[in-house]
Amino acid sequence: MKGSSALLVALTVLCICGLTRAEDDNEFFMEFLQTLLVGTPEELYEGPLGKYNVNDMAKAALTELKSCIDELQPVHKEQLVKLLVQVLDAQEDT
């Protein structure tokens, strides 16, 4: 249940940001995921979310989401990072 809630929060944040162009969407989403996996909540606000006004409730939700990700078993988090690298490499090839 916590994982489903975390995914819902992540998708909600993406919708709230109101991204419109496909390339920008992909770039934002990949930077957002990368920061979510290996960064800090503060890096989210300074990086991919830096140009958006993130309200206190959204910040609390992102902190909770980051906490859920940080509590993943190391092997699971490692696999998510590998998947992200694979996707990033595939994007560079196109």
Curated annotation (Swiss-Prot):
Entry keyword annotation includes Oxidoreductase: no
UniProt cross-references to SUPFAM superfamilies, sorted A to Z: Uteroglobin-like
Alphabetized InterPro entries for the sequence: Secretoglobin, Secretoglobin_1C-like, Secretoglobin_sf
Key words, A-Z: Secreted, Signal
Pfam families per UniProt: Uteroglobin
GO cellular component terms attached to this protein's record: extracellular region
Signal peptide range: 1-22
Cell compartment(s), UniProt: Secreted
Coarse class of the protein's main subcellular location: secreted
Tissue expression as described in the entry: Expressed in the olfactory mucosa.
Family per record: Belongs to the secretoglobin family.
Keyword Secreted belongs to the record: yes
Protein's name according to its UniProt entry: Secretoglobin family 1C member 1
